[in-house]
C-alpha cells in the first residue's frame, strides 16, 4: 500500500536556509554604524587665548623708545590672507569680547612699562612760590584773536628750593607750571602753591626720549586658533553675521587714548552705525561709527623752551624754561560745514531708534576734566579741549554757518593715569610749536535719563578706554580650531595591527577653514589638503616669533609683546601636541581618516548617513554631538586599550603556549555557549521552515499528516524491492516513518545539515583543486614557454654580440695594419735619405 504525504527535500531546505541566514547577516551588518575619527575637519568653538602683535614700527617711527614698543612685534604679512566662509553664520558680541579686555590690559602694561625706569617726582612736593608769567614778546604786527589769548594766570612762574648734586646743599630754582597742575596751599596767600597730586598719588616723570605717537598694531592669533571677521557693512556688533571670513591678524589699530571723540580709527563702509549694549539704558555708552571722517587740526602756538633742573644725584626734572613771543592758547580747528553735515546724519540715525522724540545735543553735564573735555595726546602734550561748540544745537540749526569751529584747549603736564586711580604722570614739556592733524572717526555719547519723552538729549562722554578699543574690535572674535571630529560610517576596524608611528599633520586656520560651509561629505574629500597646512603654518609662525624674540635679546627685559610671543609659541606647540596625543591614544597617529570598532549609538544622533553626510556641515554636526564628545572619546580610548591588550596576548601566545589551556573550564563554557547558540539557531530555522512548508501546502489543498504517518520514499532503480524471501517487484516506493521526539528531530536536522555542508564543501574543494591544478599546469607551461623564449633570445643576443665584436675586431685590425704599414714606409723613407744623398753625390762626381 502506498502512503502519500509530504516529502521533505532536505537539499533544497538547506540551500534556502543558508540563503536566508546569509541575507539576515548581511542586512544586520548593513544596519550597524561605527565611529570614525576625522582629523582636519573645519570646526571651531569660541575661545580665549593669548594674542600676539604684528606691526611695521620701523616704517612709522624710527625712535626706539616709542611707548607702544611695537618694535618687539612680528613684522606684518605683506600679503595677508583672508578666506571667506561660504554658507556660514556666526554670532558676535562686541560687549563680551575678550580681545577688548586683552588689548586694554596690553595698553596699560605698555604705559606702566614706559614709566618704570623714569624719575619719581616726590622731591617736588614742596612749597612753590608762584607769580603770573611775564612775557618777553614784542609788539607783533599780526593781531591775535582775543579768544586765543591765554589768561595771564594760566601759566605760573614758580620758584622752589631743591637739592643739588651735593645732598646738604640746596639751590633755589624756578620753573613754569600750568595753573591746572598746581593748587593753592593757603587761601589767604595767593602765592604759595603745591603740585596738585602730592596729597593723593605718586607722580612719575615720563622719560625724555619717549614718543607718544600711536603706531598701528595688528593683533594675531597663534597657531591652532583663528580670528573670525564679520564683513557686513551695517553690523551693529551684536547678533548673527552671515558674511564671515577668517583672518590671521586684525587690521592696524592705533591705540589712541581719547575721550568724547574717537580719533584716527576706521570708518564705517556703509551708513553711520550706532552701537550700544542697550540703547534704551541711559547708563550705557553709545558708540557712533562715522562713515566720513572730519578733520581736526590742533596746535600749541607757543614757542616754548625746555630746561633741566637737578633734583639730586641721578635725578633730573624737565620743565619749561621760557615762552618766546605772546602767550596764546592751545586750540583745535574743525570745519563747520563738515561737522554740521556729520551731526545731521548722526541725528537722523539716532532718530531711527527714537522715532517719537526730537534728537538734541548738548555739552557735557560735568565730572572730571578728562570727561568734560576732549582729552587726547598731541606730540607728547596732553590737550583738554572744550567741545561745547561742537555740540551746540542752536549754532548748527543755522544752515548758513560754514565757518571754522575753534575749540579752546588747556594743557596739563600732571595727568591722572587713566588706567589706575591714585597715580599721576608728569609729561615733559615739548620745545617749539606743536601741531597735530587728526581725523574724527567716531563719537562717544551718553543719553540723558528722565521721563521727558518728547526730547532725547545726547552729550559727549567717554573715559572708559575699553569703548575705544571696542570701536575697532567690534567685528572680530577669536575661535579655537577643533580639527578632530567623529562621525558614523559603515566602516569598522576589523583587525588589530601594530601601527607604524608616522609623522603627524595638522590644520592651519585660514585655507583650512575655507570648507566650513560645505557639507561633511564634500569637506572630508579635501582632508589631506586641509591637514597638510597646519604643521607648515605652525613652523612658519614659530619662526617669525622666534626672530622677533631674538631681536629683543639686547634689552634687559622683554616688553609685554615679547612675553606674549613666548606665550603664543608655547601655546601653539601645546595645542598641536594635544591633538597628536589623542590620535596616538586612539591608534590613529598619522591618519586623516581612522576607523574604529566602537559602535555608533543612536542616542547620540539618530540621523541617517545620507542626512549627515549630504546635508549637514561639520559645524552643525559638531553642535549635534558636542554633548557626547567626551563619552565617544572615552569609548574610543577604551577600545584601543583593549585592542592593545589583545595584541599583546596574541604576540606573547600566553593562552596557546600550553595544551592544558584546552582543559580550562572557562574555555569549555565558552565553547558550550557557542554550541548551544548554533543548535538553537538551527532548531529555530527548522521550526520556521516547517511551519512555512505546512502553511504553503495547506493553501494548496493538502492536510498536515501526523508525525507518526509513514510516507512513501522512492527507492533507487538499481535496488530490488523487499528481502530475499519476498521477491518480485512490489512498486517503486516504500514507506518510511518520520522521526519522533525533540532530540531525534534536532539530531536528524543537524545530521542532514552536516551532510549537506560536507557534500557541498567537498564539491567546492574538488572544483577549486581542479581549477588550481589547471592554473598551475598552465602557469608551468607559460613559465616553460617564457624560459625557452628567454633562452632563444639570449642565444640570439649572444650570437649578435659575438658577430659585432668579430666585425669590430676585423675592422680595427685592418685599420691598424694600414697605419703600421704607412708608418713603416715613412720610417724607411727617412732612413734612406742619407743613402739617397750619397748616391746623388756619387753620380755627380762620375
Swiss-Prot record:
Chain coiled-coil ranges: 623-657
Lipid-substituted positions (S-palmitoyl cysteine): 754
Glycosylation sites: 87, 136, 139, 145, 157, 161, 190, 234, 243, 264, 278, 291, 297, 303, 333, 356, 362, 392, 397, 402, 433, 439, 452, 455, 601, 606, 615, 627
PTM annotation: Highly glycosylated by host. The high number of glycan on the protein is reffered to as 'glycan shield' because it contributes to hide protein sequence from adaptive immune system. Palmitoylation of the transmembrane protein and of Env polyprotein (prior to its proteolytic cleavage) is essential for their association with host cell membrane lipid rafts. Palmitoylation is therefore required for envelope trafficking to classical lipid rafts, but not for viral replication.
Signal peptide range in chain numbering: 1-31
Renumbered ranges of motif Di-leucine internalization motif: 845-846
Motif YXXL motif per record, residues: 702-705
SS bond list: 53-73, 118-207, 125-198, 130-158, 220-249, 230-241, 298-332, 378-436, 385-409, 588-594
MF term (GO), any: structural molecule activity
Biological processes annotated in GO: clathrin-dependent endocytosis of virus by host cell; fusion of virus membrane with host endosome membrane; fusion of virus membrane with host plasma membrane; positive regulation of plasma membrane raft polarization; positive regulation of receptor clustering; viral protein processing; virion attachment to host cell
Keywords: AIDS, Apoptosis, Clathrin-mediated endocytosis of virus by host, Cleavage on pair of basic residues, Coiled coil, Disulfide bond, Fusion of virus membrane with host endosomal membrane, Fusion of virus membrane with host membrane, Glycoprotein, Host cell membrane, Host endosome, Host membrane, Host-virus interaction, Lipoprotein, Membrane, Palmitate, Signal, Transmembrane, Transmembrane helix, Viral attachment to host cell, Viral envelope protein, Viral immunoevasion, Viral penetration into host cytoplasm, Virion, Virus endocytosis by host, Virus entry into host cell
Top-level taxon of origin: Viruses
Region (Fusion peptide): 502-522
V5: annotated segments: 452-461, 453-461
Biased composition (Basic and acidic residues): 713-722
Region V3, annotated ranges: 298-331
Region of interest: MPER: 652-673
UniProt region (Disordered), positions on chain: 708-731
Pfam families with a match to the protein in the record: GP120 (PF00516), GP41 (PF00517)
Xref: InterPro entries: Gp120_core_sf, Gp160, GP41-like, HIV1_Gp120
Region annotation (V4) ranges: 385-409
Chain segments carrying region V2: 158-198
HAMAP family: HIV_ENV
Family from the record: Belongs to the HIV-1 env protein family.
Additional comment: Inhibitors targeting HIV-1 viral envelope proteins are used as antiretroviral drugs. Attachment of virions to the cell surface via non-specific interactions and CD4 binding can be blocked by inhibitors that include cyanovirin-N, cyclotriazadisulfonamide analogs, PRO 2000, TNX 355 and PRO 542. In addition, BMS 806 can block CD4-induced conformational changes. Env interactions with the coreceptor molecules can be targeted by CCR5 antagonists including SCH-D, maraviroc (UK 427857) and aplaviroc (GW 873140), and the CXCR4 antagonist AMD 070. HIV-1 lineages are divided in three main groups, M (for Major), O (for Outlier), and N (for New, or Non-M, Non-O). The vast majority of strains found worldwide belong to the group M. Group O seems to be endemic to and largely confined to Cameroon and neighboring countries in West Central Africa, where these viruses represent a small minority of HIV-1 strains. The group N is represented by a limited number of isolates from Cameroonian persons. The group M is further subdivided in 9 clades or subtypes (A to D, F to H, J and K).
Name assigned to this protein: Envelope glycoprotein gp160
Originating species: Human immunodeficiency virus type 1 group M subtype F1 (isolate 93BR020)
Phylogenetic placement of the source organism: Viruses, Riboviria, Pararnavirae, Artverviricota, Revtraviricetes
Gene: env
Amino acid at each position: 500500500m502506498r502512503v502519500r504525504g509530504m516529502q521533505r527535500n532536505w537539499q533544497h531546505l538547506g540551500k534556502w536556509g543558508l540563503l536566508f541566514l546569509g541575507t539576515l547577516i548581511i542586512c544586520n551588518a548593513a544596519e550597524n554604524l561605527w565611529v570614525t575619527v576625522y582629523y582636519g575637519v573645519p570646526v571651531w568653538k569660541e575661545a580665549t587665548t593669548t594674542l600676539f602683535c604684528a606691526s611695521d614700527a620701523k616704517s612709522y617711527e624710527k625712535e626706539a623708545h616709542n611707548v607702544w614698543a611695537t618694535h618687539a612685534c612680528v613684522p606684518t604679512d605683506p600679503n595677508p590672507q583672508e578666506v571667506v566662509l561660504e554658507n556660514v553664520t556666526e554670532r558676535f558680541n562686541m560687549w563680551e569680547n575678550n580681545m577688548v579686555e586683552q588689548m586694554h590690559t596690553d595698553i596699560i602694561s605698555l604705559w606702566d612699562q614706559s614709566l618704570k625706569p623714569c624719575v619719581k617726582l616726590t622731591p617736588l612736593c614742596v612749597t612753590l612760590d608762584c607769580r603770573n608769567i611775564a612775557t618777553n614778546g614784542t609788539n607783533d604786527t599780526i593781531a591775535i584773536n582775543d579768544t586765543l589769548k591765554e589768561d595771564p594766570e594760566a601759566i605760573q612762574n614758580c620758584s622752589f628750593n631743591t637739592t643739588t648734586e651735593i645732598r646738604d646743599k640746596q639751590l633755589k630754582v624756578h620753573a613754569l607750571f600750568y595753573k591746572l597742575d598746581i593748587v593753592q596751599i593757603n587761601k589767604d596767600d595767593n602765592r604759595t602753591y603745591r603740585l596738585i597730586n602730592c596729597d593723593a598719588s605718586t607722580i612719575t616723570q615720563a622719560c625724555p626720549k619717549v614718543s607718544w605717537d600711536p603706531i598701528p598694531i595688528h593683533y594675531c592669533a597663534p597657531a591652532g586658533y583663528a580670528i573670525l571677521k564679520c564683513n557686513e557693512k551695517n553690523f551693529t556688533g551684536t547678533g548673527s553675521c552671515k558674511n564671515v571670513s577668517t583672518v590671521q591678524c586684525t587690521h592696524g589699530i592705533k591705540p589712541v587714548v581719547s575721550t568724547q571723540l574717537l580719533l584716527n580709527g576706521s570708518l564705517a563702509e556703509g551708513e553711520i552705525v550706532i552701537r550700544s549694549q542697550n540703547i534704551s539704558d541711559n547708563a550705557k555708552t553709545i558708540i557712533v561709527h562715522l562713515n566720513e571722517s572730519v578733520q581736526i587740526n590742533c596746535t600749541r602756538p607757543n614757542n616754548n623752551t625746555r630746561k633741566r633742573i637737578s633734583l639730586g644725584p641721578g635725578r633730573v626734572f624737565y620743565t619749561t624754561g621760557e615762552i618766546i613771543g605772546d602767550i596764546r592758547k592751545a586750540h583745535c580747528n574743525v570745519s563747520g560745514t563738515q561737522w554740521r553735515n556729520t551731526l545731521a546724519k548722526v541725528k537722523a540715525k539716532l532718530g531711527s531708534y527714537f522715532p517719537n522724540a526730537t534728537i538734541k545735543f548738548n555739552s557735557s553735564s560735568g565730572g572730571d576734566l578728562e570727561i568734560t573735555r576732549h582729552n587726547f595726546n598731541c606730540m607728547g602734550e596732553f590737550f583738554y579741549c572744550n567741545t561745547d561748540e561742537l555740540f551746540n544745537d542752536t549754532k548748527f540749526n543755522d544752515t548758513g554757518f560754514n565757518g571754522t569751529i575753534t575749540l579752546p584747549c588747556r594743557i596739563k603736564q600732571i595727568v591722572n593715569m587713566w588706567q589706575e586711580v591714585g597715580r599721576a604722570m608728569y609729561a615733559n614739556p615739548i620745545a617749539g610749536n606743536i601741531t597735530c592733524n587728526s581725523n574724527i572717526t567716531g563719537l562717544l555719547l551718553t543719553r540723558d535719563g528722565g521721563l521727558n519723552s518728547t526730547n532725547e538729549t545726547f552729550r559727549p562722554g567717554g573715559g572708559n578706554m575699553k569703548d575705544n578699543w571696542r570701536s575697532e574690535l567690534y567685528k572680530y572674535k577669536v575661535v579655537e580650531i577643533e580639527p578632530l571630529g567623529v562621525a558614523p560610517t559603515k566602516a569598522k576596524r576589523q583587525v588589530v595591527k601594530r601601527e607604524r608611528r608616522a609623522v603627524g599633520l595638522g590644520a592651519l586656520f585660514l585655507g583650512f577653514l575655507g570648507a566650513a560651509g560645505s557639507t561633511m561629505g564634500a569637506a572630508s574629500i579635501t582632508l589631506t589638503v586641509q591637514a597638510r597646512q597646519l604643521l607648515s603654518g605652525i613652523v612658519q609662525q614659530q619662526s617669525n616669533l622666534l626672530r622677533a624674540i631674538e631681536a629683543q635679546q639686547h634689552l634687559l627685559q622683554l616688553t609685554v609683546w615679547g612675553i606674549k610671543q613666548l606665550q603664543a609659541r608655547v601655546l601653539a606647540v601645546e595645542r598641536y601636541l594635544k591633538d597628536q596625543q589623542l590620535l596616538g591614544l586612539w591608534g590613529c597617529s598619522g591618519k586623516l581618516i581612522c576607523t574604529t570598532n566602537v559602535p555608533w549609538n543612536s542616542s547620540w544622533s539618530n540621523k541617517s548617513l545620507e542626512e549627515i553626510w549630504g546635508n549637514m556641515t561639520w559645524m552643525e554636526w559638531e553642535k549635534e554631538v558636542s554633548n557626547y564628545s567626551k563619552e565617544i572619546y572615552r569609548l574610543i580610548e577604551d577600545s584601543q586599550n583593549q585592542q592593545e591588550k589583545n595584541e599583546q596576548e596574541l604576540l606573547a601566545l600566553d593562552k596557546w603556549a600550553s595544551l592544558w589551556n584546552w582543559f580550562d573550564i572557562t574555555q569549555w563554557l565558552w565553547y558550550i555557549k557557542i554550541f548551544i547558540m548554533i543548535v538553537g539557531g538551527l532548531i529555530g530555522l527548522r521550526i520556521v521552515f516547517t511551519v512555512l512548508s505546512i502553511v504553503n501546502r495547506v493553501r494548496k489543498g493538502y492536510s498536515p499528516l501526523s508525525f507518526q504517518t509513514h510516507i512513501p520514499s522512492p527507492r533507487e532503480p538499481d535496488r530490488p524491492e523487499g528481502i530475499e524471501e519476498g521477491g518480485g517487484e512490489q512498486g517503486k516506493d516504500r514507506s518510511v516513518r518520520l522521526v519522533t521526539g525533540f532530540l531525534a528531530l534536532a539530531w536528524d536536522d543537524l545530521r542532514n545539515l552536516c551532510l549537506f555542508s560536507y557534500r557541498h564543501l567537498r564539491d567546492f574543494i574538488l572544483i577549486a583543486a581542479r581549477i588550481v591544478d589547471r592554473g598551475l599546469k598552465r602557469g608551468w607551461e607559460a613559465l616553460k614557454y617564457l624560459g625557452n623564449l628567454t633562452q632563444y633570445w639570449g642565444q640570439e643576443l649572444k650570437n649578435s654580440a659575438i658577430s659585432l665584436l668579430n666585425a669590430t675586431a676585423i675592422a680595427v685590425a685592418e685599420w691598424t695594419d694600414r697605419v703600421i704599414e704607412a708608418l713603416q714606409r715613412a720610417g724607411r723613407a727617412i732612413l734612406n735619405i742619407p743613402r739617397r744623398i750619397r748616391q746623388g753625390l756619387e753620380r755627380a762626381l762620375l
